[in-house]
């Protein structure tokens, strides 16, 4: 495997699969095919929970092995988190598995290694478009002996099981919300929140898909307005009930495809 540093570790459940997983199967293309490269790491299902997108337990959130760490040029400082990509191996008759592709969700960051040139080992250095895959996903499109493999990728819609999930955390005047299981484009680009004692207020991106606001919403039902990268907006009214508590997760409506 070519040198590439992950910001944090993935959790990769043993029962997860590749593009057949119903919660990550892309339904339609959102972009044209583009060229990139991919490599893999030897994933252990018992690895610690982590990920630069804030999803934590990837099995719990429905992503499983069908995940990817994106290079700087693609990660967009976390804005790309949750987006789905269809990936296929190209230009290598020896190692590619013909006619195959996978759909993966962006859940992590492949950090650059500035000690190596971008074209000689620093695979995730700018301006490279690079996908770091768990070996279980990589082997669905190419033989592991390929190492660093030329690929093509495109953005696709994400199909998710159930609705968008809102995991509430924080304390008193500081509220954070992890937004996961987002269908459609998958990557939330802006979030607004509304209690019964306020109008719509913009939340800031804390990191990945964790959003925050400095306000006290205790004792109020909460509504959220999400806008994804394709410009679609989803409003979940009172998805978090009045009796909500920190540490709980609430499920709302889903983006329509």
UniProtKB/Swiss-Prot annotation:
Domain called Expansin-like EG45: residue spans: 50-163
Tissue and organ expression note: Expressed in panicles and flowers.
Keyword set, alphabetical order: Cell wall, Cell wall biogenesis/degradation, Membrane, Secreted, Signal
Protein family membership: Belongs to the expansin family. Expansin A subfamily.
Protein name stated in the entry: Expansin-A10
InterPro entries reported in the protein's UniProt record: Expan_Lol_pI, Expansin, Expansin/allergen_DPBB_dom, Expansin_CBD, Expansin_CBD_sf, RlpA-like_DPBB, RlpA-like_sf
Protein's organism: Oryza sativa subsp. japonica
Topology relative to the membrane: Peripheral membrane protein
GO cellular component, one term: membrane
Cellular localisation: Secreted, Cell wall; Membrane
Induction pattern: By gibberellin (GA3) and wounding.
PANTHER family named among the record's database cross-references: EXPANSIN-A15
């Amino acid at each position: 495997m070519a040198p590439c540093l992950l910001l944090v570790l993935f959790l990769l459940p043993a029962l997860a699969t590749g593009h057949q997983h119903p919660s990550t199967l892309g339904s339609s293309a959102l972009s044209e095919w583009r060229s990139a490269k991919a490599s893999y790491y030897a994933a252990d299902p018992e690895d610690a929970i982590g990920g630069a997108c804030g999803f934590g337990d990837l099995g719990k959130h429905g992503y499983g092995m069908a995940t990817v760490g994106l290079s700087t040029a693609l990660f967009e400082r976390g804005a790309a988190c949750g987006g789905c990509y269809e990936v296929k191996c190209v230009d290598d008759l020896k190692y590619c598995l013909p006619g195959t592709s996978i759909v993966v969700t962006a859940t992590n960051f492949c950090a650059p290694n500035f000690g190596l040139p971008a074209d000689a080992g620093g695979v995730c250095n700018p301006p490279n478009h690079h996908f770091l895959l768990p070996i279980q996903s990589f082997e669905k499109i190419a033989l592991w002996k390929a190492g660093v493999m030329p690929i093509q990728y495109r953005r696709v819609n994400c199909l998710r099981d159930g609705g968008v999930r809102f995991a509430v955390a924080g304390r008193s005047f500081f509220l954070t919300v992890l937004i996961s299981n987002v269908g459609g484009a998958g990557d939330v680009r802006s979030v607004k929140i509304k209690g019964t004692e306020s109008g719509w207020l913009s939340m800031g991106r804390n990191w990945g898909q964790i959003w925050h606001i400095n306000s006290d919403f205790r004792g109020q039902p909460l509504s959220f307005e999400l806008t994804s990268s394709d410009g679609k907006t989803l409003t979940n009214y009172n998805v978090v009930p009045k009796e909500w508590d920190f540490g709980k997760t609430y499920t709302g409506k889903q983006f329509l495809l």
